[in-house]
Amino acid sequence: MRQFSACIEWLFARDGDAFADRIRLAHQAGLDAVEFWHWTNKDLDAIAAAVAETDIAVSGMVAEPMIALTNPANKEAWLKGLRESIAVAQRLGARVLIAQAGDDLPEFSRAEQRAALVAALSAGADVLKGSGVRLGLEPLNTKIDHVGYYLSSTEEGLDIVDEVGRAEIGIVYDVYHSAVMGEKTEDVIGGRIDRVVHVHVADHPGRGDPGTGHIDLADRLNWLFAQGYDGRVGLEYRPRTDGAEAVRAVVKSLGG
């Protein structure tokens, strides 16, 4: 059976005043995993307690600090933060950390920024080795949500991962961002499914609940799983209707 992870930055936010309570709400909705973005602004003790209480998994979080890896001057600060992020991931049982490339910086050429990104990820792979945690580089759309971001192409993201050439480094494939950029899943992922460490879904337009837009998310997930993807699917959407019943309906519609 497919496994789904609730991004509790958005899901259950209306009913869970305390962030850790959103973990309990996700568990009550029948989900077996949650994910979130930054960890440095969270009460990790409260999160750990909720995880232990519910026996729910934390599927992933952001590798902090979220600074531009396209700037070579940021590499050492990012590696220091990566070590700290790995320790937090291990404490919470998370298997995936998410990295963003950073902005497309005008003071550097595209080639220079790519080289900086590859260098940071290569060094990061050494830090990750043996930790049980993988890092997913996430392409984001630059048409709506992340204007000025360096990495909007899934294929380029995969090419960067292949240039690094380490099992510790893969990509996060966000179906919403990919669709906004006009990509077809089979065209950009075909033959390289093993590089995908995590998947995100939301519908378009609006980045809302699956089924409210024009992306056939069930079809795209069917294709990904048929190719051999065996990880969790992160529900990273802005819910029109929050709560357990709405989330259960979404999971069912996506093959859960």
Residue ranges of predicted features:
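Active-site-proximal loop/turn and secondary-structure-junction residues that shape catalytic pockets
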Residues: 10-12, 38-40, 63-67, 102-105, ...
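Generic structural signal for hydrophobic
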Residues: 26, 51, 85, 89, ...
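Active-site acidic/histidine proton-transfer and metal-coordination neighborhood
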Residues: 53, 72-170, 180
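Conserved beta-strand positions in the central sheet of alpha/beta enzyme cores
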Residues: 35, 60, 98, 136, ...
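Histidine-acidic metal/acid-base catalytic patches
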Residues: 1-30, 93-95, 119, 151-173, ...
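Glycine-rich, proline-tolerant flexible connector loops at the mouths of alpha/beta enzymes
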Residues: 35-53, 101, 108-109, 144-145, ...
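Short, conserved active-site loops that position catalytic residues or coordinate cofactors/metal ions
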Residues: 29, 56, 60-66, 100-102
